[in-house]
Structure formats: structure tokens, C-alpha cells
């Protein structure tokens, strides 16, 4: 799939929003990518995940397990795992810390791919990497539907994205939209 084909899916799903947004990272932005608008359409989710799976297969081979952070990474991890024919699990927050629950495990020595819907600063992905590594897993790659950093985030492993785009963001104290008096909204999964 080309970047234009991926972008068409996001446009058709009305997932590209304009306004003033407070991101999970705490930064502010004039654009927001609401992947849930894409993920509500199983054919789009399957198509994008198969694309990510093909990139992963070519780039790092077949992992033992795919793992994504709740909330946004669950469907992506599941569909990528399905396309690769491997287990798919997810982490969730417990008392503010990312953890494996529901008897999910990463076995020592397993090769892991971390999947996410959107990467901005990479904070949630790094937490999942830490969980997988602490369990004895070897993280081979990260994959996301959208890389908002346009390739600027470094996880220390190959990073594959279906769509890479540069989206401006600022610390709240430097946000021009705040200075204009425009209220910021928090559209993401962590409010």
C-alpha cells in the first residue's frame, strides 16, 4: 500500500481532525488522528494490519507474539497477529503502571513486536517494550498505523508505520492556540 492509499482510508473514515487538542503526552496540537474512526471499519483495519504485517515479515521476520497497549493498540495488535499467524496480547494500566494482566505472558526468549495505533512521543510503546523485556522477551520491532513524529521517535529497534506524517505539537506553555484563547479538547483514550 502507498502512503496515499493509507491516507485515503483515514480521510474516508473522517479520522483526520483539525482544531486544538491536548494529546496523551500532554503536548498540544492543531491536528489529531482519531484511529478509532478507522478501526470501527473491520475491512480497513484488516487491510492496514495486513500491510503492517507484510512490512514486518519483510523487515524482521516472524515474531512469536504481538503485543499492544490498551486501548488503541489492542485491535492493531490483534489484526497484525492474525495476519502473521501468531499470538496477540495486550497490556493495560494497573495503578498507573503498564502491565500484563488476564494471564497474558511473554515467555523468556520470545520474539516480540509491539503494535500501536498512533505514535507521537512513543511513551506508551516504550512502556510496553519495558514490560516485554522485563518478562524476558526480545523486542524485534515496533509497528503503528500512524507515526505522527514522521520518523523522529527512536525505539532502538526497527519502526514500521502504515502512515508517517509530521504533525505540529507544542508544550502547553508554548501553544499558539492557547495564546489565542482557543480551548483544548482531549479526544484520546486517556482522559
From Swiss-Prot:
Pfam families: Pribosyltran
InterPro entries: OPRT, Orotate_PRibTrfase_bac, PRibTrfase_dom, PRTase-like
Binding positions for orotate per the UniProt entry: 120, 148
Keyword Repeat: no
Reaction(s) the record says it catalyses: orotidine 5'-phosphate + diphosphate = orotate + 5-phospho-alpha-D-ribose 1-diphosphate
Species this protein is from: Heliobacterium modesticaldum (strain ATCC 51547 / Ice1)
Protein name as it appears in the record: Orotate phosphoribosyltransferase
Quaternary structure, from the entry: Homodimer.
GO biological process: 'de novo' UMP biosynthetic process; pyrimidine nucleobase biosynthetic process
Top EC class of this enzyme: transferase
Gene3D superfamilies: 3.40.50.2020
Pathway membership, UniProt: Pyrimidine metabolism; UMP biosynthesis via de novo pathway; UMP from orotate: step 1/2
A GO molecular-function annotation: orotate phosphoribosyltransferase activity
Organism phylogeny: Bacteria, Bacillati, Bacillota, Clostridia, Eubacteriales
Amino acid at each position: 500500500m502507498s502512503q496515499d492509499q493509507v491516507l485515503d482510508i483515514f480521510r474516508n473514515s473522517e479520522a483526520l481532525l483539525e482544531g486544538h487538542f491536548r494529546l496523551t503526552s500532554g503536548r498540544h496540537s492543531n491536528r489529531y488522528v482519531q484511529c478509532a474512526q478507522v478501526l470501527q471499519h473491520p475491512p480497513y483495519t484488516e487491510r492496514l494490519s495486513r500491510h503492517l504485517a507484510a512490512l514486518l515479515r519483510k523487515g524482521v521476520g516472524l515474531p512469536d507474539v504481538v503485543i499492544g497497549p490498551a486501548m488503541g493498540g489492542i485491535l492493531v495488535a490483534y489484526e497484525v497477529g492474525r495476519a502473521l499467524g501468531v499470538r496477540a496480547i495486550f497490556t493495560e494500566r494497573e495503578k498507573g503502571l503498564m502491565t500484563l494482566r488476564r494471564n497474558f505472558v511473554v515467555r523468556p526468549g520470545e520474539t516480540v513486536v509491539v503494535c500501536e495505533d498512533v505514535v507521537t512521543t512513543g511513551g506508551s510503546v516504550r512502556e510496553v517494550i519495558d514490560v516485554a523485556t522485563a518478562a524476558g522477551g526480545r523486542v524485534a520491532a515496533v509497528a503503528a498505523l500512524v507515526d505522527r513524529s514522521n520518523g523522529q521517535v527512536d525505539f532502538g529497534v526497527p519502526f514500521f508505520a502504515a502512515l508517517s506524517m509530521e504533525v505540529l505539537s507544542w508544550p502547553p506553555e508554548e501553544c499558539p492556540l492557547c495564546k489565542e484563547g482557543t480551548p483544548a479538547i482531549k479526544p484520546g483514550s486517556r482522559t
